[in-house]
Curated annotation (Swiss-Prot):
Cysteines engaged in disulfide bonds, as pairs: 3-46, 14-34, 20-40, 24-42
Domain of life, per lineage: Eukaryota
Record's function text: Plant defense peptide.
SUPFAM superfamilies: Scorpion toxin-like (SSF57095)
The protein's name in its UniProt record: Defensin Tk-AMP-D6
Family: Belongs to the DEFL family.
Keywords assigned: Antimicrobial, Disulfide bond, Fungicide, Plant defense
UniProt-listed GO biological process terms: defense response to fungus; killing of cells of another organism
Amino acid sequence: RDCRSQSKTFVGLCVSDTNCASVCLTEHFPGGKCDGYRRCFCTKDC
């Protein structure tokens, strides 16, 4: 199961899952995706 946490360092509107995932890597998460409100959420197994 995936747990989600909003990115602390992502700035601006999230339009690219790739950019979001890159920022999440710097926050020690394995990945991330944009949600419907254009925010970046980092994901990890929980």
